[in-house]
Each structure stands twice: as C-alpha cells, then as structure tokens.
C-alpha cells in the first residue's frame, strides 16, 4: 500500500502546473522533439511497409517479401530504441519535478493528514486499515499549485 500512496503522490505532483511546464519545456528541447518526430516517421514507415506486405503479398517475390520483413524489423528495432530514449527523458523530467516538489509535498501531506484526521493502522509490512474514501491526490495537486504560486510571487 506504500506503493499505492507513492503512486498517488506522484500522480498529484505530475498534475501540477509546475510539472506541466516542465514537460512543455521538455517537448521544446530540440533533441527530445527530434526523437519524437523520428519515432513518428519510423512508426508511419513501418505501418506503410506492413500494409504493402499485406496488400501485395501475392504479387511480390519471396526475396521482396524478405526485404520488406527485414526492413520492418529494422524499423521496429530503431523505433524501440528511440521510444526508450523518449521514455527515459520523460522519467528523468518526472523524477526531477518530484524531487524538487518533495519538501512542499511533505508539508502539504502533514497539513492534510491533520486537517482530515487521517488515521492509518500500520502493520509491520503493510497498511492494515485505511479509509478508501480518502483519496488525497486532487487535494495534494491543488494545494501544491497554490503553495508554488505563492512561493513564486514571493520571489
């Protein structure tokens, strides 16, 4: 259940304006955007080859079919490599946002736990009881947005 709480916090943090801005900045990075574009092109090319193969299979020679299949495999491998690069950058961005906002998250969690009188019964390994009706994700997101807006206007 600790994983569930961590996932909820991550979801809350990633829904903040700060996070949205960080991902917008990522999308504007030339390396990242060219990787996304390259992935799009590879996906389209691969799709076209697959369609050609299915439409023209009867008229193509075995050699042509083999060439197309190899080309599809190459494009799939390239696509997988680029998608991994894209996902790595997205994960790095998310991790950085999460690290940067963690002090604010902890403070807000303490306030929410006090305000909502959250009580958890903890076992050695897991949460034995928790109020399922108590999902703090949206509260954390909106409180973070407010807190961070206040911080920025103080600077």
Annotate each PLM feature.
Residues 10-16:
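Short acidic, Gly/Ser-rich segments with clustered Asp/Glu that frequently serve as metal-coordination loops
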Residues 9-10, 124:
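Residues immediately flanking
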Residues 108-137:
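Extended, charged amphipathic interaction segments
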């Amino acid at each position: 259940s600790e994983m569930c709480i961590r996932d909820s916090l991550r979801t809350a943090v990633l829904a903040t304006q700060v996070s949205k801005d960080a991902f917008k900045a990522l999308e504007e990075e030339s390396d990242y955007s060219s990787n996304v574009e390259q992935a799009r092109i590879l996906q389209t090319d691969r799709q076209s080859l697959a369609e050609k193969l299915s439409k023209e299979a009867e008229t193509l020679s075995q050699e042509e079919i083999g060439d197309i299949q190899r080309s599809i495999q190459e494009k799939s491998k390239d696509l997988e490599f680029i998608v991994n690069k894209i996902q790595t950058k997205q994960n790095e961005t998310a991790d950085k946002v999460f690290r940067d906002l963690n002090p604010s998250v902890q403070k807000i969690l303490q306030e929410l736990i006090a305000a909502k009188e959250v009580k958890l019964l903890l076992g050695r390994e897991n949460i034995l009881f928790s109020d399922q009706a108590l999902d703090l994700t949206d509260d954390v997101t909106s409180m973070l947005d407010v807190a961070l807006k206040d911080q920025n206007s103080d600077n």
